[in-house]
């Protein structure tokens, strides 16, 4: 005889609650209920029960409440809408009846060592096919014909719960037991103390009348109707059982026992050998469950115990990478049946419904129903915690969970560490953190996680996946429900960014809408996110809850701590794709990449100057506003930047935290250390685009470029004089104030600038830290080294705008320009004489004081000028470093070389203002001008004879001393003057270097050439005072005066004069 198989749905092995019933359960009872339900479902899956994951299981796995007002609301609007399709889908996909795979007879059951029932031989429960085909259920309450019993159950449960019509079980077939129960509203279980009746499922009774037996809990000796409470994994095989309470001796079903144990807290179970203490019944059951379950399922790979088989199975699949379910179309593998079924619906295009208002197609029923609330804007639940937020919710579970932060309630507690949580999912997730095992590992980077959801979020970093997309604006969202919470008009505000988290999306939407609902009660500042508000409030409270375990430094933000810890680890996870440079912070990488792109997105509204960083723009704004918000507590000085303040405070503390690894020298600033290290490396990364000169520092390059641009941005407020360098301005301002802050401890000399004092100290110490890489010569100042290096390179970067002459040093250019301007800013306080150079003034003042601080180590001779001492040293060494490029002649002084070059070129740039006479050297002009003034400042100490020139005085003094220090090497003749020796030597050599431009005649001496040139010019500069006759040479004047006028006077005295 042909028989059809009757299949069983998941509802046959589950317990459902109404809203009122769920309210009576306590936290421990709800947790126990969740564990039982999840365990039952895991065993159904393990024996091949293929089904889309029930909604109640999904809720329990997420830690949500299994009952919500949404279910009741949807069933009122769409009676039987969900369970019909669910049952149809199961029957269409099921290849053979599940009765054969799940249920076994009582005779075929055996008991394992752990006390679990083992499935060995299945049995069949058969129904006549003619009856099976005619099954049709009718609801008498509202006269509806329903195709299956489950649909009738839903309809009757919602509309006719108060009716008490009874149906014959045998006449209506056992399949209508649920419908009969809904009409009967039977209440067969009663508590003896308060005679309260309860209504729960009894549909297992007719199927398993022969399987009734009573289970007793080994831990407390308490009789229970269902061994599930005592951790029997086959609770779905048992029908209703007898539950025995030791105190009341009453029978209860599962949920009645839960409620009874919740109210009856007086009862204690005394003999718990596992824990050695007495406790209430609820705690005993829970402890017994935890104790026994942890030993049932153990992972051999990781050594971790599980209370249910499903986590063990999932753990093993994670380790082995085994996937039980494979897609036929795309060959994608899945470790869970629920994920496989959802994937098949996606590929097949099996969409539950398409919404009429927005044409969005959704794959799941819950998504469709929840999506409808977006358009209707139905939010049933309103939070009114003392008028704090007035926030509304679609679901009551969300409202309850939202209210816990307001009330401070933490209902769920983890017993290992006594930590409590607001959400039921948190203590479930917490043990993984507490124990330290992480089941879920990333295949890309090897990072492990306690929760699969965290692994899924982490994988989006590698895949850059944004899970869901809204067609309205091109954005990606966490779910279709969140994606449609804003209209397409709102989405047009930006260009399609993507977000992988719901919180990110909501925060981004508030930015677009300008919404800032969270306000600080201290300062009134508003924020778009509550996390931003909490972080901001720590500014007022000073709270820094995050502490570094390495250095004990505390931070107000957890992200700041994470970033700080990279200082200790040296981690630089962010790498530039262009140059490969790595950075500690992502923001630093983005800022660095602007170097390659040249992007400067931040523009000043006052001067339109652009910046690569927003911080640089803010700092720049303070130039316009003059704001200096950061003040030093020690000296009261204020600064525009906090970094400058911190660096300034090191002056007071003396701290120098930055040390050079090469030489051990320490610095106050990190930038100073980096600049110093370039001395060791010789690196000069900054190059001038005009002259290609390189510099070790960017600031030096900017200062150098002012030479080409002529820019002088620093102006003196007193005299309006401008300067190219800020340091030069500060030094100049000390001239007006007369203040000299820096004093030498050795000699007491004071200076305007600290750098001048540092340079001066090297005179006492003899330190010369700057060495020439070409010749090894050392210098006390870096500027001296730079000037010296130009001798090797021949570079003369400073050019005169008037005559085009170039100079090695800028100071030489400035002095030269005074020739054209006639400026002599330095005046002698004694005689009022002015000088174009400060050094000339200092040398002149020594004439009045008689000071000669520079002494020759060879002969002990002293000099007023250091340059004169150096020139004197060359007499002993015979050094003549200055060579003429035309004739090869060398000179000991550069002034002699310049005079020699002018002799060859005939250049005479210096002109007498009185007579217009020109000279090749400036000293010649000064000496010549004394002819007009009659000044003779140099006087002989022996005879008192004055002289116009110092050189003439020195020559004269040799008459008194008889000194003739210059000797001819050829004939041994000695001379008192070097010029006389040079002239004498030309007799031996026959050299005549001085040539007349008019007739080409050559002479041995320059004085002879000058006398000869008077023949061509007709000049007779020497005039007789007696008769007014003029002569070309001075010697001729003397002869004339002797012969004519002296002789006449002699004759007149002797009586021979004319009568």
Curated annotation (Swiss-Prot):
<keyword id="KW-0238">DNA-binding</keyword>
<keyword id="KW-0479">Metal-binding</keyword>
<comment type="similarity">
    <text>Belongs to the krueppel C2H2-type zinc-finger protein family.</text>
</comment>
<dbReference type="InterPro" id="IPR013087">
    <property type="entry name" value="Znf_C2H2_type"/>
</dbReference>
<keyword id="KW-1017">Isopeptide bond</keyword>
<feature type="zinc finger region" description="C2H2-type 17">
    <location>
        <begin position="826"/>
        <end position="848"/>
    </location>
</feature>
<feature type="zinc finger region" description="C2H2-type 10">
    <location>
        <begin position="630"/>
        <end position="652"/>
    </location>
</feature>
<feature type="zinc finger region" description="C2H2-type 14">
    <location>
        <begin position="742"/>
        <end position="764"/>
    </location>
</feature>
<dbReference type="InterPro" id="IPR001909">
    <property type="entry name" value="KRAB"/>
</dbReference>
<dbReference type="GO" id="GO:0071294">
    <property type="term" value="P:cellular response to zinc ion"/>
</dbReference>
<feature type="domain" description="KRAB">
    <location>
        <begin position="8"/>
        <end position="79"/>
    </location>
</feature>
<feature type="cross-link" description="Glycyl lysine isopeptide (Lys-Gly) (interchain with G-Cter in SUMO2)">
    <location>
        <position position="178"/>
    </location>
</feature>
<keyword id="KW-0862">Zinc</keyword>
<feature type="zinc finger region" description="C2H2-type 2; degenerate">
    <location>
        <begin position="352"/>
        <end position="375"/>
    </location>
</feature>
<feature type="zinc finger region" description="C2H2-type 24">
    <location>
        <begin position="1022"/>
        <end position="1045"/>
    </location>
</feature>
<dbReference type="GO" id="GO:0000976">
    <property type="term" value="F:transcription cis-regulatory region binding"/>
</dbReference>
<feature type="zinc finger region" description="C2H2-type 13">
    <location>
        <begin position="714"/>
        <end position="736"/>
    </location>
</feature>
<feature type="zinc finger region" description="C2H2-type 6">
    <location>
        <begin position="518"/>
        <end position="540"/>
    </location>
</feature>
<feature type="zinc finger region" description="C2H2-type 16">
    <location>
        <begin position="798"/>
        <end position="820"/>
    </location>
</feature>
<feature type="zinc finger region" description="C2H2-type 9">
    <location>
        <begin position="602"/>
        <end position="624"/>
    </location>
</feature>
<feature type="zinc finger region" description="C2H2-type 19; degenerate">
    <location>
        <begin position="882"/>
        <end position="904"/>
    </location>
</feature>
<feature type="zinc finger region" description="C2H2-type 8">
    <location>
        <begin position="574"/>
        <end position="596"/>
    </location>
</feature>
<feature type="zinc finger region" description="C2H2-type 1; degenerate">
    <location>
        <begin position="325"/>
        <end position="347"/>
    </location>
</feature>
<feature type="zinc finger region" description="C2H2-type 5">
    <location>
        <begin position="440"/>
        <end position="462"/>
    </location>
</feature>
<feature type="zinc finger region" description="C2H2-type 18">
    <location>
        <begin position="854"/>
        <end position="876"/>
    </location>
</feature>
<dbReference type="InterPro" id="IPR036051">
    <property type="entry name" value="KRAB_dom_sf"/>
</dbReference>
<dbReference type="Pfam" id="PF00096">
    <property type="entry name" value="zf-C2H2"/>
</dbReference>
<protein>
    <recommendedName>
        <fullName>Zinc finger protein 658</fullName>
    </recommendedName>
</protein>
<keyword id="KW-0804">Transcription</keyword>
<feature type="zinc finger region" description="C2H2-type 23">
    <location>
        <begin position="994"/>
        <end position="1016"/>
    </location>
</feature>
<feature type="zinc finger region" description="C2H2-type 21">
    <location>
        <begin position="938"/>
        <end position="960"/>
    </location>
</feature>
<dbReference type="GO" id="GO:0006357">
    <property type="term" value="P:regulation of transcription by RNA polymerase II"/>
</dbReference>
<keyword id="KW-0863">Zinc-finger</keyword>
<feature type="zinc finger region" description="C2H2-type 20">
    <location>
        <begin position="910"/>
        <end position="932"/>
    </location>
</feature>
<keyword id="KW-0832">Ubl conjugation</keyword>
<dbReference type="GO" id="GO:0005634">
    <property type="term" value="C:nucleus"/>
</dbReference>
<feature type="zinc finger region" description="C2H2-type 7">
    <location>
        <begin position="546"/>
        <end position="568"/>
    </location>
</feature>
<dbReference type="InterPro" id="IPR050826">
    <property type="entry name" value="Krueppel_C2H2_ZnFinger"/>
</dbReference>
<keyword id="KW-0678">Repressor</keyword>
<dbReference type="InterPro" id="IPR036236">
    <property type="entry name" value="Znf_C2H2_sf"/>
</dbReference>
<dbReference type="GO" id="GO:0008270">
    <property type="term" value="F:zinc ion binding"/>
</dbReference>
<feature type="zinc finger region" description="C2H2-type 22">
    <location>
        <begin position="966"/>
        <end position="988"/>
    </location>
</feature>
């Amino acid at each position: 005889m042909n028989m059809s198989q009757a299949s069983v749905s998941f509802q046959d092995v589950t317990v459902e609650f109404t809203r009122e019933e769920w309210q009576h359960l306590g936290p421990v009872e709800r947790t126990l209920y969740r564990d039982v339900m999840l365990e039952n479902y895991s065993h159904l899956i393990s024996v091949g029960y293929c089904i889309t994951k029930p909604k109640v299981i999904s809720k329990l796995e997420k830690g949500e409440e299994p009952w919500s007002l949404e279910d009741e609301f949807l069933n009122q609007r769409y009676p039987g809408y969900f369970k019909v399709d669910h049952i149809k889908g199961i029957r269409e996909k099921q290849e053979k009846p599940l009765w054969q795979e799940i249920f076994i007879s009582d005779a075929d059951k055996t008991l394992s060592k752990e006390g679990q029932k083992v499935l060995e031989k299945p049995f069949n429960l058969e129904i006549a096919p003619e009856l099976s085909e005619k099954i049709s259920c009718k609801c008498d309450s509202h006269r509806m014909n329903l195709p299956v019993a489950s649909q009738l159950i839903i309809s009757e449960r919602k509309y006719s719960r108060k009716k008490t019509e009874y149906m014959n079980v045998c006449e209506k077939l056992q399949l209508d037991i649920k419908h009969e129960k809904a009409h009967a509203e039977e209440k067969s279980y009663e508590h003896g103390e308060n005679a309260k009746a309860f209504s729960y499922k009894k549909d297992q009774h007719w199927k398993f009348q022969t399987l009734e037996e009573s289970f007793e809990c080994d831990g407390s000796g308490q009789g229970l109707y269902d061994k599930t409470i005592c951790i029997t994994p086959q609770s779905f095989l048992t029908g209703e059982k007898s539950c025995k309470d030791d105190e009341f001796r009453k029978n209860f079903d599962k949920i009645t026992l839960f409620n009874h144990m919740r109210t009856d807290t007086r009862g204690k179970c005394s003999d718990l050998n596992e824990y050695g203490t007495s406790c209430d019944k609820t705690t005993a059951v829970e402890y017994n469950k935890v104790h026994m379950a942890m030993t049932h399922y153990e992972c051999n790979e990781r050594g971790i115990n599980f209370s249910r088989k499903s986590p063990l199975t999932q753990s093993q699949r994670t380790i082995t990478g085994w996937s039980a379910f494979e897609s036929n179309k795309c060959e994608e593998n899945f470790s869970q049946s629920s994920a496989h079924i959802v994937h098949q619906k996606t590929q097949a295009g099996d969409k539950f419904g398409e919404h009429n208002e927005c044409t969005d197609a959704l794959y799941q029923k819950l998504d469709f129903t929840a999506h409808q609330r977006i358009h209707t804007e139905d939010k049933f639940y309103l939070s009114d915690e003392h008028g704090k937020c007035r926030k509304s919710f679609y679901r009551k579970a969300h409202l309850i969970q939202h209210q816990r932060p307001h009330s401070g309630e933490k209902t769920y507690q983890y017993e290992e560490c006594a930590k409590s949580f607001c959400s039921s999912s948190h203590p479930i997730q917490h043990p993984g953190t507490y124990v330290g095992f992480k089941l879920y590992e990333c295949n890309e980077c090897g990072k492990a996680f306690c929760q699969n959801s965290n692994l899924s979020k982490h994988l989006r970093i590698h895949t850059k996946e944004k899970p869901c997309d809204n067609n309205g604006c091109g954005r990606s969202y966490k779910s279709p429900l969140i994606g449609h919470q804003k209209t397409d008009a709102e989405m047009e505000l930006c260009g399609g960014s993507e977000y992988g988290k719901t919180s990110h999306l909501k925060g981004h939407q508030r930015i677009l809408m300008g919404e800032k609902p969270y306000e600080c009660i201290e300062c009134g500042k508003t924020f778009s996110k509550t996390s931003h508000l909490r972080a901001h409030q720590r500014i007022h409270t000073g709270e820094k809850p995050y502490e570094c375990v390495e250095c004990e430094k505390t931070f107000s933000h957890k992200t700041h701590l994470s970033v700080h810890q990279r200082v200790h680890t040296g981690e630089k996870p962010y790498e530039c794709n262009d140059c490969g440079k790595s950075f500690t912070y992502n923001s630093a990488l983005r800022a660095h990449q602007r170097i390659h792109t040249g992007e400067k997105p931040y523009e000043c509204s006052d001067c339109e100057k652009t910046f690569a960083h927003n911080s640089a723009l803010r700092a720049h704004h303070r130039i316009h506003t003059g704001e200096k918000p950061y003040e030093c507590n020690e000296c009261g000085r204020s600064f525009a930047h906090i970094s400058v303040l911190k660096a300034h405070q090191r002056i007071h503390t003396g701290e120098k935290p930055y040390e050079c690894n090469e030489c051990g020298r320490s610095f106050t600033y990190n930038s100073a250390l980096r600049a110093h290290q370039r001395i060791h490396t010789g690196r000069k990364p900054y190059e001038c685009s005009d002259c290609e000169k390189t510099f070790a520092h960017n600031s030096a390059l900017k200062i150098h470029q002012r030479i080409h641009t002529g820019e002088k941005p620093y102006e003196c407020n007193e005299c309006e004089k401008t300067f190219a360098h800020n340091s030069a301005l500060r030094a100049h301002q000390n001239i007006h104030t007369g203040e000299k802050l820096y004093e030498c401890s050795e000699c007491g000399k004071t200076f305007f600038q600290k750098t001048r004092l540092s340079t001066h100290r090297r005179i006492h110490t003899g330190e010369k830290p700057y060495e020439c890489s070409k010749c090894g010569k050392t210098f006390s100042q870096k500027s001296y080294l730079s000037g010296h290096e130009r001798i090797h390179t021949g570079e003369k970067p400073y050019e005169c705008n008037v005559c085009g002459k170039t100079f090695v040093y800028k100071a030489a250019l400035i002095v030269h320009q005074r020739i054209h301007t006639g400026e002599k800013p330095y005046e002698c306080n004694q005689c009022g004489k002015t000088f174009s150079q400060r050094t000339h003034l200092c040398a002149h003042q020594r004439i009045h004081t008689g000071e000669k601080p520079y002494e020759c180590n060879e002969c002990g001779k002293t000099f007023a000028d250091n340059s004169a001492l150096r020139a004197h040293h060359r007499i002993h060494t015979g050094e003549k470093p200055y060579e003429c490029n035309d004739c090869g002649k060398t000179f000991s002084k550069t002034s002699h070389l310049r005079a020699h070059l002018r002799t060859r070129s005939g250049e005479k740039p210096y002109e007498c203002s009185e007579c217009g006479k020109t000279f090749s050297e400036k000293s010649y002009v000064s000496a010549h001008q004394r002819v007009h003034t009659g000044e003779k400042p140099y006087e002989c100490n022996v005879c008192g004879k004055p002289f116009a020139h110092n050189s003439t005085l020195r020559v004269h003094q040799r008459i008194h001393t008889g000194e003739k220090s210059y000797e001819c090497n050829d004939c041994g003749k000695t001379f008192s003057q070097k010029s006389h020796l040079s002239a004498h030597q030309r007799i031996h050599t026959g050299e005549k270097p001085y040539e007349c431009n008019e007739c080409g005649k050559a002479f041995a001496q320059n004085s002879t050439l000058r006398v000869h040139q008077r023949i061509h010019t007709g000049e007779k500069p020497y005039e007789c005072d007696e008769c007014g006759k003029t002569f070309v040479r001075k010697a001729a004047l003397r002869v004339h005066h002797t012969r004519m006028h002296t002789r006449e006077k002699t004759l007149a005295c002797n009586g021979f004069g004319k009568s």
